[in-house]
Structure formats: C-alpha cells, structure tokens
Amino acid sequence: MKRFWAMVCALFLSVSLLLTSCANVPTGLTGNFREDTLALISSLREAIALPENDPNKKAAQAEARKKLNDFFALYRRDDSLRSLSSFMTMQTALNSLAGHYSSYPNRPLPEKLKARLEQEFKQVELALDREAKS
C-alpha cells in the first residue's frame, strides 16, 4: 500500500511540475503585446521618477527589473514583433536600462539616460497608437 501511495504522490508531483512549467505567459503579463508594453512603461516611469532617498525605491527597482525580465522572456523570441517599430524601440530602451542596472546596480540613473528613456517611451507609445490604427 505504501508503494501505491508513493507512486500516486510522485505522479501528482510530476504532473503539477509539468503543468506549471508549461505556462507561456510570465506572471503579471497578459500576452497582449500592446497592453504589456504600456504597463511596463508605466511601471518603469514610476521606478525612474522616485527620488533616490525614497524608502520604496529599492522595491520599485526590483519590481521593474522583474517585469523587464518577464517582458524580455515573453516577447524577445517572437518573430512577428521584430518588424514593429514599437518593439524595436522598446527593446533599445530596455537594453540600455538593463545595461545600467547590471553595470552600476548601486548608482542612480544619470539624467541623460532618464531623458533618453523618456524619449524612447514616448516613441513607443506613438508607434503603438500607429500600429493599432493600421
């Protein structure tokens, strides 16, 4: 009888592991490129805008990094998005932000990078509007 329950338990754990690892959409993303991009931009703007002495700054940066990684994981390999200017501009912005976070994790974002990111976020929003209309 013990052997039977051990096999049932092993089967249950295997199936649950298989089902959770097959999920296509990372937590917090809808799978809709436009909605996810706008949500990520909003989250990144909030994290960037917080002053350095804000106690919530570290948590906001960690959340932004997680969303950034989830976004990359979901959309980077989607070939249908490579022709969209919104995707390419967003990828450029995220690469520059990820590069800063990996090279200088304890330093604040330079004003020049903040301005560049804001400009690219606006370009992405305009491109998303254009792409939605066409």
From Swiss-Prot:
Lipid-anchored residues (S-diacylglycerol cysteine): C22
Chain residues carrying a lipid of type N-palmitoyl cysteine: C22
InterPro entries membership: PSII_Psb27, PSII_Psb27_cyano_bac, PSII_Psb27_sf
Protein localization: Cellular thylakoid membrane
GO biological process: photosystem II assembly; photosystem II repair
Alphabetical UniProt keywords: Lipoprotein, Membrane, Palmitate, Signal, Thylakoid
Keyword Iron-sulfur: no
Membrane topology: Lipid-anchor
Keyword Transcription regulation listed: no
First and last residue of the signal peptide: 1-21
GO cellular-component term (any): thylakoid
Family: Belongs to the Psb27 family.
Function: Plays a role in the repair and/or biogenesis of the calcium-manganese-oxide cluster on the lumenal face of the thylakoid membrane. Its presence in a photosystem II (PSII) preparation prevents binding of other extrinsic subunits PsbO, PsbU and PsbV, and thus assembly of calcium-manganese-oxide cluster. Psb27-containing complexes lack oxygen evolving activity and an oxidizable calcium-manganese-oxide cluster, but have a normal reaction center.
Subunit and interaction comment: Part of a photosystem II (PSII) assembly intermediate complex PSII-I; crystallized from a strain deleted of psbJ, it forms monomeric PSII before addition of the oxygen evolving complex. PSII-I includes 3 assembly factors not found in mature PSII (Psb27, Psb28 and Psb34). Binds to the lumenal side of PSII, adjacent to the CP43 (psbC) subunit.
Protein's UniProt name: Photosystem II assembly factor lipoprotein Psb27
Species this chain originates from: Thermosynechococcus vestitus (strain NIES-2133 / IAM M-273 / BP-1)
